[in-house]
Amino acid sequence: MSEAEKTDVLLVGAGIMSATLCALLRLLEPNWSMTLVERLDGAAAESSDPWNNAGTGHSALCELNYTPARPDGSIDIAKAVNVNEQFQVSRQFWTYAVENGVLPDVRSFLNPIPHVSFVTGADNVQYLRKRYEALVGNPLFGTMEFIDDAGEFARRLPLMAEGRDLREPVGLNWTQDGTDVDFGALSRQLLGFGAQQGMDTLFGHDVTNLSQNSDSTWTVKVVNRRTGRKRTFNAKFVFVGAGGGALPLLQKAGIKEAKGFGGFPVGGQWLRTGNPELTAKHQAKVYGLPPLGAPPMSVPHLDTRVINDKSWLLFGPFAGWSPKFLKQGKVTDLPFSVKPDNLVSMLGVGLTEMGLLKYLIGQLLLSEAARVENLREFAPSAKDSDWELDIAGQRVQVIRKAKGKGGVLEFGTTVLSAADGSIAGLLGASPGASTAVPAMFDVMKRCFADRYPSWEPKLKEMVPSLGVTLSDEPKLFEEVWARGTKVLKLDKPAGAIPATTDGQSTAGTEHTPTAATV
């Protein structure tokens, strides 16, 4: 057997998480050797691919599941603020990366698109008013508007107004400062920077085994999927950023921190159109309320997307189901992930998450016509012939042990790391990619505890708010926000966005609040 090739850092998976960690470590430790292993033939071809996710820069501006109403009717904004704080960290790092040549083409991955919450019915409009009142006093949400005027609704969202009975109350929380993110293009630029700085990249290679050595390093065996050639690496640190493939690899590694964890795969589907007559009439990411009793992943939204310099509309998500943990995975992924240490967790979720089961069954029974009928709640004039069904990526929801319940399903992103800091991985889904930078800061703090203090001055240069809650520091927020807006070109209209039917565009422009705006 050939001698193991030594590397300081080995990254598994070429998606947004590995790409972000790659760029951060390259900037902090340019002399470290680094190797990337990806099973597919290109970067960001699974969950980070723009067609496999919603592309929302998740900052809780429009996602109503982050702002639940309390029993007394008041609005709990804690989760929304936390998600937004994390997105601000990512936004600041992208700003630094653009300024320093790490990200050479900002418009290829980031476009300004308003983020909008949408409801109908008097009670829901009242909820949206309360949500606005609870959030707008926080600096991170200071530009939010509340709109309940039918005429203003029709002006800003003409496609959604077309064919709608506007005698029924409608309400919007409108934030002009939202973003559409192509995480695939972003990942490729970050990995391109890593490769330029000497990182070895192995595409079309599978990791077949991971085992820890007595000196805490890892022996990682890989195989070329085309030629069958086998290689062995000796890595001081391993990061498993393999999306749905992370859990099986962490199980192979045998770290005790992964014991008890399970995964439940849920597929995504979208209706999409590139019809310019329709894209001109809708220039926002508009999120509604989830169906009663449905899981957070079911929140419906009608989104403007900018992908490869073309404007699209996506509506969904609709759930699909497959036992695969990756879109290009294997049908054995789910059954092979069941182990003695997570069997109770998996069975517990099966017995307690009846709402999810009911939701999935209902989704799987939907016909094409029924999906378009759901779309008509947002765009009443939608025609079946204008829309096509697109199969998106797989998301593996985390199952964690819980006392008295066996296991619970977690909707979010979870970092797992070994106690000795020699290996880490990321599990879960939304807000996921939008929080890649703070998630990787967490990985670095856990796994490089001895070095992290010496990195902090450089990290603070990248992210000026590091260690600070921006909600409590409005002046600092104003400074980093203004700098980011200029550097990231978020003060310019979005690329590939056509003018609306009245010759104006709501995307990527500032506007003066009207009489319809509270």
From Swiss-Prot:
One of its GO terms (biological process) is tricarboxylic acid cycle. It holds the Pfam family Mqo. Pathway: Carbohydrate metabolism; tricarboxylic acid cycle; oxaloacetate from (S)-malate (quinone route): step 1/1. Signal peptide: none annotated. It catalyses: (S)-malate + a quinone = a quinol + oxaloacetate. It is an enzyme of class 1 (oxidoreductase). One of its GO terms (molecular function) is L-malate dehydrogenase (quinone) activity. Residues 495-518 are annotated as: Disordered. Keywords: FAD, Flavoprotein, Oxidoreductase, Tricarboxylic acid cycle. Disulfide bonds: none annotated. Its cofactor is FAD. InterPro entries: FAD/NAD-bd_sf (IPR036188), MQO (IPR006231). The keyword Transferase does not apply. Its EC number is 1.1.5.4. PANTHER family: L-2-HYDROXYGLUTARATE DEHYDROGENASE, MITOCHONDRIAL. Belongs to the MQO family. This is Probable malate:quinone oxidoreductase.
